[in-house]
Amino acid sequence: MILELDCGNSFIKWRVISPGGRERICAGIVDSDDGLFEALAGSGVKVQRCRLVSVRSDAETEQLVTRLKASLGVEVVCAQSSSQVGGVRNGYHDYQRLGLDRWLALLGGYHLGQRACLVVDLGTAVTADFVSADGEHLGGFICPGLPLMRDQLSTHTRRIRYDREVALAALQELEPGRSTAEAVERGCLLMLRGFVAEQLAQARSRFPGGFEVFLTGGDAELVRDAVPEAQVVPDLVFVGLAIACPLS
């Protein structure tokens, strides 16, 4: 079995797949290294190989890799920056500066679409990347995601305070808010949708011959109905990870 890890800024997304990658055995999201090992122990699955992508610091990533090797007895393959992989050419002036999660997501999108594509990852931050039909990464955009927008308002505005349940309830519709929670949550979501709409407009201009749209990340479902042509692929980073780090 192969353990795949996507170590983000706030959470670790994990899944165990069959050796050929065709079957997902189990999966989950945890908020700490301890939570990861508890989840793996509870799954009862024996892992033979492991590959991961991390946007953590080098020290934090190395600490996790060391623990994985000691606890699971496996070698760990880590995704690295590259100028070209899987038919896609990195579009950054300095390819090492492109976030690994973005790189893998656009690799995954191009692999699935097999033509020009727009890849939007809606997490703590929101990223949008454009890939041409011949695999040229044309660059992209980054903006705060819902968690960051929400946190900034609560941090810098004393009277904005509400819990997660209230936030979720506020997003059931997008009418003008009749409470602070509704006004904040709906306003932030409308900003997010506006960002995505602009990416679509740019993609239509850049790719007159047609393109695919891929949404991924924890908040992808919140903009799905605004982008009916999009494919929501929760594991898009893992699709790219398999391309960047093949395991024989």
UniProtKB/Swiss-Prot annotation:
GO terms for molecular function: ATP binding; metal ion binding; pantothenate kinase activity. InterPro entries: ATPase_NBD (IPR043129), Type_III_PanK (IPR004619). ATP binds at residues 6-13, 124. Its EC number is 2.7.1.33. K(+) binds at residue 121. This is Type III pantothenate kinase. Pathway: Cofactor biosynthesis; coenzyme A biosynthesis; CoA from (R)-pantothenate: step 1/5. The keyword Disulfide bond does not apply. Belongs to the type III pantothenate kinase family. It is found in: Cytoplasm. It holds the Pfam family Pan_kinase. Substrate binds at residues 92, 99-102, 180. The active site is at 101 (proton acceptor). It catalyses: (R)-pantothenate + ATP = (R)-4'-phosphopantothenate + ADP + H(+). Homodimer.
